[in-house]
């Protein structure tokens, strides 16, 4: 319901899905539901790095410390933030190279880092190393980037068995938004003419996990996952897992 151009996305899916074995109601519904959640309802295809200085300290503090930089000058400066937090990782160059911003997260399942852009370009024969904006602006390329990740992680087998919980863990690293993913998966299955009840024999996988189960989080960690866990628990969300 939030998608800005549903007809355009349907056309792109009809073109791309058959080429990469997203070719059954179960696989199509799973892909649409998972990517829909990850992209805010098929609306957001470029990583939002518009963080306050406080949020930067909570979420990316270790990268600023590693770069010997104070977060305050980076307050609400997305390009500068990307160039610090993604520097010297994932085959990106240093802060001054601009690779962090150039290869920031894009697509329905955020393709991030020069190494991943290069691997995707090589495997799928599409030029995104020199033209990374294709991943967020060209619908077919955007879908291909998500399918590349999907197939690398063997997600069709979970789609075939209706194991949305494990699929979510492989994509998200935890179970954030599981209920929403399941809701849209059921909707998509219904629209594709598949009997949802056939996929509900094992109730365990549709159970919303407790906040303690969100991701692999340990004391001392500072991350987005910690922020989300704290919000789920109703406590101050400072991104710092500790007393």
Regions found by a protein language model. Give the residues of each.
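Short acidic, glycine/serine/threonine-rich helix-capping segments at coil-helix boundaries
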Residues: 211-243
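Low-complexity, Gly/Ser/Thr/Pro-rich intrinsically disordered linker/tail segments
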Residues: 170-214, 231-232
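Second-shell loop/turn segments in exported
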Residues: 1-4, 17-21, 30, 71, ...
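Acidic helix/loop microenvironments that form the catalytic cleft of cell-wall polysaccharide enzymes
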Residues: 35-38, 159-177, 243
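Solvent-exposed, polar/charged alpha-helical surfaces in well-ordered, non-transmembrane soluble domains
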Residues: 11, 15, 29-32, 144, ...
